[in-house]
């Protein structure tokens, strides 16, 4: 069998082997692992073969077999395995057979598994026997000894491994047994190993790790005698063991104990003196470990204070020794070292709120200065990658918390120190870019601190306070500062633009508002902003310029300035579509800058709208200047016979640009549009329709056309747009490849039309003509049977649910915009029965609770509109009163509503009121019942009473239910109904 196993291992590890053969090899090896015969074979091979004759791969596999079977053996077999392992170990030691590290680790893991099975009763002297193997002073024996103990810890003591309650209980029993039998001998052996510094570095390192692992659940007194502590601390001076020594000391500090004892432990360790004497100039990893050790000292002292405030003086004494070390690490040139002491600093500032004796102004001043200096970029960080930028931003955010914490403790210190830093960084002589950037960053922080009132000033007086006036002065000086123009650095430029956009409200209220805003616009439209050579700054500034213009809305009455802006921006408005590609993960990657470019188009629309109407000729000129290149582009796309994907994408982008320009114009005050501008938008609408006709089979062009028209709607009056909309709807609706998601979006678009033109006769007639075909198409799509392929595609199911929501929202738009008469006109009344039927169908289907809830809301709407003798009750529907009542609809709704109200919560097993979604549906059902009762009065109550009685509800309960329906207000009735359902279903 040995040869079979070896052959299977070779095949499994051979990268060039036949895949089917490899699968067979893995299956065979797994069978060996899982069978008793495989275990017997493995044990026999290991025990009978000379220790140096088995090849490594085979030996590793045999160890795996033993490990996987160890917990399933009976006591006799387990004892045999234990004896065999010790015999093998003895042979290895005697023959000084040093296997590769991975084999020694695996054997140690086998020992650990066996230990958990035999130590309690079968082999109580397991650890004694293990310790005995080290008496020869063999380095190999010590190596195995330490590895086995570390593996035992992994099995029974590692807190980061999740275990079942049974295993946790077993491990507690094992630890109790170790404490009572072997703890003292084990700890003594570890310090004996450490006292002999001639032992192998690997053995010494393992031993330090063992102490770190076991101290958590062993008697602390065994570890903290002066001699023991000196032994451990001595290893801080040994290069190969010092990192592990730091971890060991941290674990000793973490040991849970009474506050007084912990304070004594910190004093005994005297680590502040030790750390102060260590050379921290060479090894960065070691410096980081020492910093974490210092941080842990601080955290433990604060825990002592939290648990026993009476120890404040002693804790403060220790903290005063610690602070110089912490401040040194905080100011370290490497951020990873600095971050190591962040937890202590954060907790310290929190503790200072309770114990003001912990700090002095001098300490906090030093801490504040160190914090601010760490916020500064290194001067050589000239072109950091995005990940580095993100990490530094997070680093700064944590430092800012310290800054704010200090500000809340000593506001005067903060108000005095930070403005000095800002002034020195920004306005005192020539400074390198990183100093200037720090000044802008601190200026932004300063404003945030004032906004969040970390200085605890009276809220009503913040805007009049000296710090706020200082901030205003700094910001104005910054806007007018020449260095913004002179210093060509991306971080300076992006920081400036972010800062001025963030503080737009200050600019809007400033006495020199116009001058400042125009100065900023000038900088935005210079090579520092929109035309920046740095992609990141340039693209970000496109968005920020749009935000700035939208938030400040300057009055654009300077024709020369406007033309200058347009002239600068025109090269950026050239649309050049680029097809997406796929990356190495096969994800679609968008190419080109069109998404960013849309901010420029929107800004241009906004800019034109900010020109006063007395300059209407300029407005028209600029609209034409924006539109005409796009019209030319679309004409070119249409003229190309071969509609390749790149041509379709170019047409899509051009249509989106038209819509986006108009969306920007939509921000004009009070939506008053000069007729000349309306005419230009009308021209754009015609161009969109011509393009759509020529690209009607393209989903992206249909989407872009709908997008554009959605933006035209607020500007074009109904007389102009009704004909356009008729054509748009006809083209899109007749497309042969219309997707479900498109229909959903289209319904949303129609809802917008219904809202915008709800009083317009032309649009009413347009919707009236289209409603029946719309309902038929939507319900036809939703009723299509699910094919086998669709059942494997959750996106189709998701799209259908979205379509249900879309049609329900469209019905809602019709009703809330006072157009319910559309449902019962001569053209559409035949579809009403189907619509109502679908509402009940969707209400019953709680596979998507959002759909069910929305359907019930529409039923409430229908009851409100038709619930009184079928006559439309909405007085604002100007066509409703001329239409005859819908005969029988109120009684039909009454019957179906009552059925729904009790069948849905009681017959659906999954309808559990503990789930918030179902609880909301129950509340909507209560509203549905209450609405009908208010509409039909006694007639509804009588029908409901008969229904409940027929369903088997007692007369008293029926009377109580009906009485509450009549007498309770809506809020209380919702509570009552939920309680009623819960009690009847036997839910808690």
UniProtKB/Swiss-Prot annotation:
<dbReference type="GO" id="GO:0008033">
    <property type="term" value="P:tRNA processing"/>
</dbReference>
<dbReference type="GO" id="GO:0031267">
    <property type="term" value="F:small GTPase binding"/>
</dbReference>
<dbReference type="GO" id="GO:0005643">
    <property type="term" value="C:nuclear pore"/>
</dbReference>
<keyword id="KW-0813">Transport</keyword>
<dbReference type="Pfam" id="PF08389">
    <property type="entry name" value="Xpo1"/>
</dbReference>
<dbReference type="InterPro" id="IPR040017">
    <property type="entry name" value="XPOT"/>
</dbReference>
<dbReference type="InterPro" id="IPR016024">
    <property type="entry name" value="ARM-type_fold"/>
</dbReference>
<keyword id="KW-0819">tRNA processing</keyword>
<dbReference type="GO" id="GO:0016363">
    <property type="term" value="C:nuclear matrix"/>
</dbReference>
<dbReference type="InterPro" id="IPR045546">
    <property type="entry name" value="Exportin-T_C"/>
</dbReference>
<dbReference type="GO" id="GO:0000049">
    <property type="term" value="F:tRNA binding"/>
</dbReference>
<dbReference type="Pfam" id="PF19282">
    <property type="entry name" value="Exportin-T"/>
</dbReference>
<comment type="similarity">
    <text>Belongs to the exportin family.</text>
</comment>
<dbReference type="InterPro" id="IPR013598">
    <property type="entry name" value="Exportin-1/Importin-b-like"/>
</dbReference>
<keyword id="KW-0820">tRNA-binding</keyword>
<dbReference type="GO" id="GO:0071528">
    <property type="term" value="P:tRNA re-export from nucleus"/>
</dbReference>
<keyword id="KW-0539">Nucleus</keyword>
<keyword id="KW-0694">RNA-binding</keyword>
<comment type="function">
    <text>tRNA nucleus export receptor which facilitates tRNA translocation across the nuclear pore complex. Involved in pre-tRNA splicing, probably by affecting the interaction of pre-tRNA with splicing endonuclease.</text>
</comment>
<dbReference type="InterPro" id="IPR011989">
    <property type="entry name" value="ARM-like"/>
</dbReference>
<dbReference type="GO" id="GO:0005737">
    <property type="term" value="C:cytoplasm"/>
</dbReference>
<protein>
    <recommendedName>
        <fullName>Exportin-T</fullName>
    </recommendedName>
</protein>
<keyword id="KW-0963">Cytoplasm</keyword>
